């Protein structure tokens, strides 16, 4: 699989008005299966995307890997009494809507998240994401797009992974892009997903992108920040859609999802 690096500069963006609010089952246990992010480095993933409550300035992980907040991210402000999960680069709340205020990366993993102590977690670099998705042994057999009970996203499987009996997966990416392309590639039931989770599978929902007060590309694309700057105004993110995965340079004031890891 070839990794593309490009800039998102002026593409037409479709506004999707559906939201997927987090439900409230008990949180899943932390994921423990290791993923290689370099030849000599492994990590384990948090069990859900990072979420922030601005008014109380508290953090937590989504209760389930498939959870994402959606359009209510548009209310992102220091006085918002609700949860958000699309962050500006290395920050929660910028002083205004320009990338000039976001000159320093502050790793979300250094924060106190739920009951975890400071510095428990960290953010992957662009090189680590590239190695995990494209360069580790059998990488093309450890990645897939899918729709899980109507939630589109990217599946990642741990090192030395074996598929559970009775589940026949299609690895890789769809032949075309679009919201429906995920399900057309493959659809998983909640029972199948629970089986995959038990084997250490990670799911990154296609949680979209926040630009100022607009939320776009929900269930079309996933945008996940890396710890890597590109230049003074842009930083690198992992971007996937149904038919490809890329590392993109995007404006630091865009709101994107965050999935943290800890060293294994």
Annotate each language-model stretch with its function.
Residues 16-19:
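C-terminal motif of bacterial Sec signal peptides marking the signal peptidase cleavage site
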Residues 11-14, 254:
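Processing junctions and N-termini across compartments
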Residues 21-23:
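Bacterial signal peptide processing site
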Residues 27-264:
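Conserved positions within compact, well-structured domain cores
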Residues 1-9:
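Bacterial N-terminal signal peptides that target proteins for export
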Residues 10-11, 27:
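Terminal low-complexity, poorly structured segments
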């Amino acid at each position: 699989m070839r990794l593309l690096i490009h800039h998102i500069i002026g593409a037409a963006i479709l506004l999707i008005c559906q939201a997927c609010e987090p439900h409230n089952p008990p949180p899943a246990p932390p994921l423990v299966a290791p993923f290689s992010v370099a030849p000599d480095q492994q990590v384990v993933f948090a069990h859900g995307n990072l979420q922030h409550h601005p008014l109380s300035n508290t953090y937590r992980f989504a209760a389930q890997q498939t959870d994402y907040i959606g359009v209510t991210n548009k209310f992102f402000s220091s006085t918002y009494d609700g949860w958000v999960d699309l962050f500006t680069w290395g920050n929660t709340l910028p002083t205004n809507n320009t990338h000039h205020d976001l000159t320093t990366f502050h790793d979300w993993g250094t924060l106190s998240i739920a009951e975890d102590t400071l510095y428990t977690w960290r953010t992957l670099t662009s090189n680590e994401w590239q190695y995990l998705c494209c360069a580790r042994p059998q990488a093309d057999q450890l990645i897939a797009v899918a729709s899980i009970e109507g939630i589109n996203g990217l599946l990642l499987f741990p090192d030395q992974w074996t598929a559970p009996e009775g589940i026949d997966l299609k690895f890789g990416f769809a032949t075309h892009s679009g919201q429906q392309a995920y399900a057309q590639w493959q659809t998983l039931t909640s029972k199948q997903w629970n089986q995959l989770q038990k084997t250490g599978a990670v799911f990154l929902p296609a949680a979209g992108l926040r630009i100022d007060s607009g939320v776009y590309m929900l269930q079309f694309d996933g945008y996940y920040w890396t710890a890597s700057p590109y230049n003074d105004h842009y930083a690198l993110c992992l971007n996937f859609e149904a038919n490809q995965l890329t590392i993109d340079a995007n404006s630091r004031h865009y709101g994107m999802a965050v999935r943290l890891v800890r060293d294994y």
